[in-house]
Amino acid sequence: LHSTSRRQRQMCIRDRGIKVFIATGRHLQVINNLGDLEFDGYVTLNGSCCYIGRDRVIYRRMIPEIALEHLIKYQEEKETFPCIFVREKDMFINYNNQHTREVFRMLDFPEPVVKDIHEATREGVFQLIAFFSEQQEDRIMQALPECEATRWNPLFTDVVPVGGNKSIGMEKILAYFGISREETMAFGDGGNDIPIIKRAGIGIAMGNANQDLKEIADYI
């Protein structure tokens, strides 16, 4: 749809008293594909940081420091891979390679500053964006028992605290507004949307969604 048409439809929905939210794996500062659309709130970083509007934070959950120590030890002793460390105000990456640059171009994502991996333990980290393959995932995640991976791209996965996902963020938003789960509808297309599609009153998979998501959705 044309951006003006999207905005008009969204305004019509909100004028009817329906609240509209974004649930994303991205940091609020790098959400760059919404144009001038306005939302009632944002579930960002796969549920780790939730906003009312763009300014009021109502929920935060960070990766345990011990998990970051485990990650550093794994990279020092076994194998290295690029990893973006997402903090409240900024993010950094331990190093770049061909895959990271490809993803940054594909997603129009600003290339993070490069810092030593030990910087990760000096300030709270909400989420990791880890550039390892599906074949590497099992062995790497075994070294991070405090975390779980939510993959929506073959080149990288989001890593969040165990039990952290978009549905947790949705629950925080619903509690804030006093909305029941049965009154909700969620749309998604990626693997990290599965929890919120399952949890919503009505879960809808987009036509381009992966098969796992389509199988648990109420509608496609």
Predicted regions and their residues:
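Glycine/small-residue-rich loop that forms an oxyanion/phosphate-binding "nest" at active or ligand-binding sites
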Residues: 43-45, 55-69
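Substrate-recognition element of Asp-dependent hydrolases with the DxDx(T/V) motif
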Residues: 10-34, 46, 86, 126-131, ...
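Asp-based, Mg2+/Mn2+-dependent phosphohydrolase catalytic module
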Residues: 199, 204-220
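Substrate-recognition/cap helix-loop segment adjacent to the acidic, metal-dependent catalytic center
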Residues: 26-43, 133-148
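Single conserved hydrophobic/aromatic residue that forms the stacking wall/gate
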Residues: 1-9
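Structural recognition of alpha->loop->beta junctions
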Residues: 35-54, 123-124, 216-217
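Conserved acidic, metal-coordinating active-site core of Asp-based
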Residues: 74, 79-187, 191-199, 208
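Hydrophobic/aromatic beta-strand patches that form the interior of the parallel beta-sheet core
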Residues: 21, 43, 185-187, 204
